[in-house]
Amino acid sequence: LSGEFGLNGLDVANPAGGDLFVSLHANAHPRRNRDGVETYFLNVAADRYAARLAERENGLDLGEGDEQAARILTDLDAKASALSSRRLASLVQQEVTAGVRARVGDVRDLGVKSALFYVLLGARMPAVLVETGFISNREEERRLASARYQDEVASGIARAVTQFSRSAARVAAAR
């Protein structure tokens, strides 16, 4: 959405009450031999600025008497969101790399990382950013342009989302 319409995808996902958010990207690096897939999640629990942003985004009123309670609730919400996002990121990374290896060819697994990406800030649902390969690497650029690779990345993400949703449904049913 962002490139085509000038929007952050969360401008659509948050008001629509989305259950999760996946942002797809092609990576780049000055060293043209860099390759691989990596998945990021936002971990705001330790970031004061992000915690204040979450307070604002979640509409918490930080009145004098309730300020500490609101901060505790915001911190708990941020930690729960980071845990869910990390779990989703792990599933996406695992399914995308395994699927590409099985159906397209070898791929470097660069792992799951947390970072302060603008596109993930303010998500009111588990949110991840997937770097599907390095467009600065000629071989990966060709791979990224191939329908076969794109289909397998999409299929891997779909498998991860299905697993994540089933797991969330089991947790909700157990409550």
Mark where each language-model region is.
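Active-site-proximal helix/loop segments of hydrolytic enzymes
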Residues: 1-175
